[in-house]
């Protein structure tokens, strides 16, 4: 194979093509590759930031959930304490009311007892006078001896 003008012409054309490609085609291709590489790096950074943000959000949600559970437990405990307090107050109110009713009933019983005692004393006085009349066989003046009968009834 001889080196002739065709081979030299083809070599010159190839060399010019390579220079043209290096000068005009290669820089935009390299720029596109660098831009694509930068976009990929930015996407990876954004993905790692998103992963960190997701992890932080999950931690925050977990913390808020724990706080909500603690707050709910505290509210339940306060409700239990308030319920116990209400029951104790109702119990105390019922006890006071029962004591009041008991004292009122006791006073009514005492009043009724005093009334019955007075009635019994009055009857006892007249019975004593009647009994004394029958025993003595004479009439006793009830008005004259009322003071004596009242003293006797008071002693009884």
From Swiss-Prot:
List localization entries.
Cell inner membrane
Q: Which residues cross the membrane?
A: 12-32
Q: Which molecular function GO terms apply here?
A: proton-transporting ATP synthase activity, rotational mechanism; proton-transporting ATPase activity, rotational mechanism
Task: Provide the disulphide bond pattern.
Answer: none
Extract the Gene3D superfamilies matched here.
F1F0 ATP synthase subunit B, membrane domain
Superkingdom to which the source organism belongs: Bacteria
Q: Name the keywords, alphabetized.
A: ATP synthesis, Cell inner membrane, Cell membrane, CF(0), Hydrogen ion transport, Ion transport, Membrane, Transmembrane, Transmembrane helix, Transport
Q: Which GO terms describe its cellular component?
A: plasma membrane; proton-transporting ATP synthase complex
Q: List the InterPro entries.
A: ATP_synth_B-like_membr_sf (IPR028987), ATP_synth_b/b'su_bac/chlpt (IPR002146), ATP_synth_F0_bsu_bac (IPR005864), ATP_synthase_B_chain (IPR050059)
The membrane topology noted for this protein in its Swiss-Prot or TrEMBL record is: Single-pass membrane protein
* Similarity-based family: Belongs to the ATPase B chain family.
SUBUNIT field: F-type ATPases have 2 components, F(1) - the catalytic core - and F(0) - the membrane proton channel. F(1) has five subunits: alpha(3), beta(3), gamma(1), delta(1), epsilon(1). F(0) has three main subunits: a(1), b(2) and c(10-14). The alpha and beta chains form an alternating ring which encloses part of the gamma chain. F(1) is attached to F(0) by a central stalk formed by the gamma and epsilon chains, while a peripheral stalk is formed by the delta and b chains.
Q: What does this protein do?
A: F(1)F(0) ATP synthase produces ATP from ADP in the presence of a proton or sodium gradient. F-type ATPases consist of two structural domains, F(1) containing the extramembraneous catalytic core and F(0) containing the membrane proton channel, linked together by a central stalk and a peripheral stalk. During catalysis, ATP synthesis in the catalytic domain of F(1) is coupled via a rotary mechanism of the central stalk subunits to proton translocation.
Name of this protein? ATP synthase subunit b
Which lineage do the record's taxonomy fields give for this organism? Bacteria, Pseudomonadati, Pseudomonadota, Gammaproteobacteria, Pseudomonadales
